[in-house]
A protein has these predicted regions:
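A general secondary-structure boundary signal
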Residues: 23-27, 33, 84, 98-100
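Soluble or luminal CAZymes and related metallo-dependent hydrolases
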Residues: 3, 7, 46, 92
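Short acidic-aromatic low-complexity motifs
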Residues: 1-30
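A beta-strand edge to alpha-helix "cap/lid" segment located at domain peripheries
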Residues: 48-124
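A short gly/proline-enriched turn/hairpin at secondary-structure junctions
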Residues: 32-42, 57-59
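Short, hydrophobic secondary-structure boundary micro-motifs
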Residues: 24, 34-35, 64-67
């Protein structure tokens, strides 16, 4: 049976490869993906459809699913692996922060935020 480190690796591979099967294999039944661009959090049963919406949305903004993850911080405490990272999608202005939590059953939470310097400047 895979451990939390292997499940976390499988999860990110699923995103890099846009492979819904790998995503579904790596998450818990009570998985939640919280994206502020969505009307409500996404559960495991909706994850494949969300991935297709994400790909279409980001491609319309110029991205091609090539990622840069930087400023990664990892904590493994009490059986929960927590990853924080800055993400950017090449070819677009999309960037933000991600928080991913994984236990030995799988990834159970991902929460992302978006950063937009222009929008932030215009709202001040």
């Amino acid at each position: 049976m895979p451990n939390r480190f292997e499940l976390r690796d499988l999860y990110i591979q699923g995103w890099y490869e846009l492979d819904a099967g790998k995503l579904l294999e790596s998450v818990t039944d009570d998985f939640v993906f919280d994206d502020p661009a969505e009307p409500c959090p996404v559960g495991k049963t909706e994850l494949g459809a969300y991935m297709r919406r994400w790909d279409a949305r980001t491609r319309s903004l110029g991205a091609d699913n090539r990622w840069i993850l930087t400023d990664e911080v990892r904590q493994d405490r009490d059986g929960i692996l927590t990853d924080w990272e800055w993400w950017e999608l090449l070819g677009s202005s999309l960037k933000g922060m991600g928080l991913i939590k994984t236990n030995d059953r799988g990834v159970f939470l991902e929460r992302i935020t978006y950063f937009d310097r222009v929008a932030n400047r215009e709202s001040i």
